[in-house]
C-alpha cells in the first residue's frame, strides 16, 4: 500500500506534481511551504497548509512520503538541498511516473524521480535520484542522467547520452547521440548539441557553441 504523502512547495511545479500524484491515486494530506505559512494561508490548491518545512517535525517519516514540488526557481540548488537534508534525517521521497508516460521495463529509477505526462524513457536508461523528466521529453536508449538533473518540456535526448549531476536541458533542446554533458551544464532552450559539453558550461544554438569568456 502506498503511504500518504506530504507535498513540498507551492509553485507551478508543485501544482503539476500534486496533479500527477492524484492521477496515481496517492493521498496527499497537505502541503508545506514557508511562503504560505508566512501569509497565514490554511488551504492551497485544495490541500491543507501544514506550515513551513519545520512542520515536518510533527510527522513520522516512517508513515509518510514526501512529494518534492520544488522547481528550478529561485535557485537550481534549492530542490537538491531540500532532498539531501530531509533524506539525511530519514524521510522517503516518492518517485512518480505519470500514467501517460512510457518508461521501459528495464529502466533504473532512483528516488524522487518525476516523469511527467507524455514523456518517454527508453530501454537501458538510468535516472539517478532527484531527476525531473518533464512533459513530452524523449530520452532514448542507454542514457544515464545524473542526480538532480532537469530535462525540460519537449527536450530530446538521443541514445547513449551521459549527463552529470545537476544538468539542465532547456525546453525543446536536442542532444545528439553519445554526447557527454558535464555536471552542472546548462543547455539553453531550443539548442541542438552535437558535441561534449564541459562541466558548468552554458551552451546554446545549433552547434551547441560555448560562449566566449
Placement of each model-derived feature along the sequence:
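Short glycine-rich anion-binding loops that position phosphate/pyrophosphate groups of nucleotides
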Residues: 13, 71-74, 209
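Short glycine-/acidic-enriched loop or helix-start segments at secondary-structure transitions
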Residues: 16-18, 41, 77-79, 197, ...
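Conserved acidic residues
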Residues: 29, 64-65, 165
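Phosphate-bearing ligand-interacting subdomains
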Residues: 40-98, 102
Amino acid at each position: 500500500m502506498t503511504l500518504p504523502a506530504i507535498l513540498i512547495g507551492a509553485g507551478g511545479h508543485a501544482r503539476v506534481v500534486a496533479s500527477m500524484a492524484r492521477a496515481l491515486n496517492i493521498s496527499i494530506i497537505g502541503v508545506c511551504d514557508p511562503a504560505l505559512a508566512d501569509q497565514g494561508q490554511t488551504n492551497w490548491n485544495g490541500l491543507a497548509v501544514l506550515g513551513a518545512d519545520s512542520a515536518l517535525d510533527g510527522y513520522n517519516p516512517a508513515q509518510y512520503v514526501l512529494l518534492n514540488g520544488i522547481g528550478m526557481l529561485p535557485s537550481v540548488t534549492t530542490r537538491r538541498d531540500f532532498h539531501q537534508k530531509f533524506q539525511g534525517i530519514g524521510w522517503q521521497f516518492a518517485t512518480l511516473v505519470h500514467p501517460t508516460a512510457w518508461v521501459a521495463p528495464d529502466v533504473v529509477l532512483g528516488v524522487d524521480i518525476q516523469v511527467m505526462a507524455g514523456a518517454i524513457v527508453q530501454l537501458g536508461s538510468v535516472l539517478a535520484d532527484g531527476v525531473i523528466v518533464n512533459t513530452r521529453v524523449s530520452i532514448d536508449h542507454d542514457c544515464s542522467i545524473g542526480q538532480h538533473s532537469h530535462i525540460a518540456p519537449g527536450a530530446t535526448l538521443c541514445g547513449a547520452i551521459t549527463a552529470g549531476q545537476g544538468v539542465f536541458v532547456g525546453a525543446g533542446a536536442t542532444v545528439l547521440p553519445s554526447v557527454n554533458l558535464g555536471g552542472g551544464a546548462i543547455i539553453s532552450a531550443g539548442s541542438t548539441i552535437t558535441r561534449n559539453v564541459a562541466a558548468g558550461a552554458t551552451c546554446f544554438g545549433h552547434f551547441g557553441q560555448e560562449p566566449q569568456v
